[in-house]
Amino acid sequence: MKVTIIGGGNLGTLMGATFAYRGHDVIIHSSKPEKFSEEIEVYGKNEEFLYKGKINKVTNDWKEAIEAADLVWVTVPPQMFVETAKLIKPFTHKGQMIGIVPGAGAAEFAFESLIDDGVRFFGLARVLSIARVKEYGKSVYMLGPAPELLIGSIPAKIANEICQEIQPLFGINCRPVANYLVVAFTPSN
């Protein structure tokens, strides 16, 4: 699967390394692409090396990052949702998956025009793991992986389909919930 991650911080770096390690084509959109190495190493809480993933590209070009992606993960803070949606809209297409992690209330409004255009919009109730950058663009800590992922989507009826498509990215169980609001208002977010 061709996966783009918007945001090269703690979570985006961990997700990029994980998906690349699991054999997917990964692009990270970052404001500082020059700081990233080709491979990102993942470490556990006791400094033990877990794995590394080879990132296909790190870019600050929206078209290059979004246009060919099957799945786009948005890992930026909620206050950046409206601007992010505007910037990626020209390069999204019907059927493309847009995932918010962690899912947040009001994201559905920020991305409403993309949903209206036919993107498959969803959010995770929690993150893959607590993540902390060890060395920016080069390594990251995975501190407490989640036992499973909860997915809520708009429209709600596609949550099971999305779970089936994204579960191989993470290698952990994915469970659909009734609707996006269940994800958006989970107390852990």
Where are these regions (language model features)?
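Residues at the C-termini of beta-strands that transition into short coil/loop
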Residues: 32, 62, 102, 125, ...
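Rossmann-like NAD(P)(H) cofactor-binding subdomain of soluble oxidoreductases
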Residues: 78-136
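Rossmann-like NAD(P)-binding element
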Residues: 49-99
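NAD(P)+-binding Rossmann beta1-loop-alpha1 motif at the extreme N-terminus of oxidoreductases
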Residues: 1-50, 66
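A general structural motif
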Residues: 23, 69, 94-95, 118, ...
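Internal alpha-helical scaffold of NAD(P)-dependent oxidoreductase catalytic cores
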Residues: 136, 141-189
